[in-house]
Amino acid sequence: MNIQKYGLSSDISIKLKTKVDKIKEKKEEVLKLNTSTFYGKAEVRLINDVSILDGINKSVVRYDTGKISEGLLHQEEMKRGVEKRPNCSETRKTHFHDNCVGLLYNILRLFYLIDINFDEYDAYATYFQDNALLVINVHLFGDQPFSSLENFVVQPVSVNVICKPELNETFNSNSNYLKVGNTIDEHFLKELVNGTQDIENIIVRLVKDNRLFTQFDIAYGMVAQVFMQLKPFLVEGTYWIAEPLLMNIPELKTQRGRYPSLLDGHLWKLTNSLKLLLKIASYTQKYLLSIEKYSEEREKKMLLNGEINESSGLLHDVVLAAELFNVKHASYYNVHAGLDRFQFLRKPLKSLVMFTDVVKERDGTCDFCGTYFEDSRMSTSYLCDENRKGENRKLEIRDLVPYLYPVLLRGVLSLPVFESRLKFAAKVPIYPKGPLYTTDTHTYNYLMNCFVPMNEEQVLSACYRFFAKSAENELFEA
């Protein structure tokens, strides 16, 4: 498995104050480690996305509508010595809808899949392990290997023909037209693509000849969104991994190679380069949902150019990255392409129930043996040694706590979670015998995030309270 690790070194201090004692502990150079993997689950949905005219000859675009004008196009064609007027009915029918993002995304994805050269997938390799639980790949990704990349080229069945659309009124308006050079060789090689260098050459040529710079930025950002999955620190965080990602890919629709005048002259360009923001978004902002609790209300409140942004794709990441780094950014294309951050949060999250098998040891402590997540959208089980059998306990988490999947970004914003001096504060009562207790899952997760970096062991026990309060209002261990 290809794994990359990166982290942030910091000093951690824990202060515990009780009625009878004060405990202080400090650990220097603690590495908050994030481990990432290329493995993940994804689903694809083809969408009809917006038209992106960046790169088109600005002389044929009307500034008041932002659309290609048939009259202006005719004037540009006349300058080239083309006497025949472009087909008016076909021009109005197509409106020159242009979106090549899906094509570029798939070519880029192919480039990285071949370049990475994945090791053989082991369905029973360890994905997550701590002192009590073991999760293997098959629990999350299934036992099927990756699709073969050996046979991915479809050989042409007929000789390519050079078409001159300005001289052909019967040109099919439903076809896609891209410029592939000034000449076309009718004799194809047996192997069209030999490796990453060939794919890179194809990408460069497509982008340069068709002036698809803005669309390439978007496609690159989409690849960055799904390129790696961060592994959670706690087993509860595998909820984010078990659910498949939903990638919205625009259908290929382009007319920019139909008339030579469309790719002449100065570029029509509405947006600045997204490369910087996309890089920020891909490496920092993609997992912000792990820190901040998102909801539909949060999504609907996000503003873009003064209007509510309903998009949850790549544009959502770019806007958040701009907010995070205080970078001015205006996008005139409300694209819906990219990873849907909210596909499994849109449904009401009534309750996430975690069933835990507990094995009671001789000393009375409990070890976690297996964990089962159940709710309306998923049913995932993580099993340990079959010989270890225990009684069934139920821990109900009424809300997904973001810190179940802690990915810490520091020194960026003035928000407490981004400050260099990050603080976790949790006020909990203490048993007369010594153990801490709490009935609040948020407090519990704050405590876990304090103790885990200190390499402290935690034992979770279930407690209950009598319906009728006793004289001392005591709590008893289950």
Swiss-Prot record:
Species per Swiss-Prot/TrEMBL record: Schizosaccharomyces pombe (strain 972 / ATCC 24843) (Fission yeast)
One Pfam family it belongs to: LA-virus_coat
Organism domain of life: Eukaryota
Gene3D superfamilies named among the record's database cross-references: Major capsid protein
InterPro entries: Major_coat_LA-virus, Major_coat_LA-virus_sf
Name of the protein this chain belongs to: Uncharacterized protein SPCC1884.01
